[in-house]
Amino acid sequence: MTAAVVPLVAEHDSWITVDPILGCPADCAYCYLGPLGLRAARPAVRATPEMVVAAVEDYLCGRRAGVIDPATDQTPLCVGNYTDMVLTRPNREALVRIVALLAERIPRRPLVVVTKGRLDPDLLAAVDGHGFPIYWFLSQSLGRHAGLPLERGPIADLDTTLDNARLVSRTAHQKAVHFWRPFVAELRQSRAELETLVGRLATADMACSVVVGLTRGPGVPTREERLVTLLPESMAAPAGQWEVFDEEGWTDARATALAAGYPLYRNTSCALAFLGGEPEALGTWRQPYNAHRCLPAACPLVQRGRCAVAAAGEWTDAATLAARVAAYLGLGAGQVSVTAGELVIGDMIDEFDYNTLLHGYGRHLAIRAQGVRRQKAWLGSFTEGGLAA
């Protein structure tokens, strides 16, 4: 994948991404922007806010509307997956304008912004008045805290991340999530440090944390010198391991979070469900994902109850759905079937189309295909390079 082919609007794993700006002034060793030439780069605007929102409208009401009703769809929109919308003034100004225009033009749905920047009250106030839920994923690896210079540039340290969460908690429509990545052995906290950290996260009104390992594979900077030097154990993992994750550290972090009553998740989709008070949308609670990404999470019982309701549901209009999906994918009617809790596609499928079907039906059905063609720079936990039927 190259920067030239990054779509303006695309269906990622947990959300629809909207990317009017490419390039991030931060320089994080593990970031997928590195191989794209977009790391430690001046952000380049390729679409005005007006163009962006028109593209979102076209996307939601175009081909996608054949399988998901844009009037009721609650798939979040994430603004800025190939930049940081907070790290420069023009980016912040664009974000404010995009939020305002979205509120004018599309039905209410959650918005997501992933950032390592410092939030300020004026920015939060500017985006809060439109009534859209806004979820700030505050990315904090704790690398600086551990003395490992994995990140360079104008990014938040732990204290600033916690201050950001406090500011967000004072708004009417916004919530903060700690995006804990990469979660690897070299950054492992002691049990005492974890107890202190979880306590600080909770008292800062962080809604929850999402713990993500070091992703590897196509589009990921595995030859980055800092990764090889600072994370030698993680980089020495077997070549076929698409995510390097500190299981021992996770055991301690999970136990600490459970003891403190602090939600700790392995999937962003679980955090989004918790924030919205809804069942998880992609089926993380379904096999084969539940053993590693659902059951081990420090998830409140009330949220597990919401997902249990979704798990018990059945799809009743199989023929209509199969025909709808076949038309969406341009396949013959006999190549799509709905049976025994599964939507089965008898062909390869593009990753963005697979994600669209997950967003529309993953809460109700397992989505199976002959394989998934990767379309972005990193692998998702559901596709993992190609989910076989």
For the regions a protein language model found, what residue spans apply to each?
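Generic preference for hydrophobic/aromatic residues in regular secondary structure cores
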Residues: 1, 6-8, 12, 209, ...
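Glycine- and acidic
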Residues: 13, 36-38, 149-151, 180-181, ...
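Conserved Radical SAM active-site core
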Residues: 2-135, 350-351, 355-389
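Conserved AdoMet/S-adenosylmethionine-binding subsite of the radical SAM
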Residues: 53-62, 66-234, 240, 249
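Alpha-helix capping and helix-coil boundary motifs
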Residues: 48, 190-193, 317
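C-terminal accessory extensions appended to soluble enzyme cores
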Residues: 7, 219, 223-389
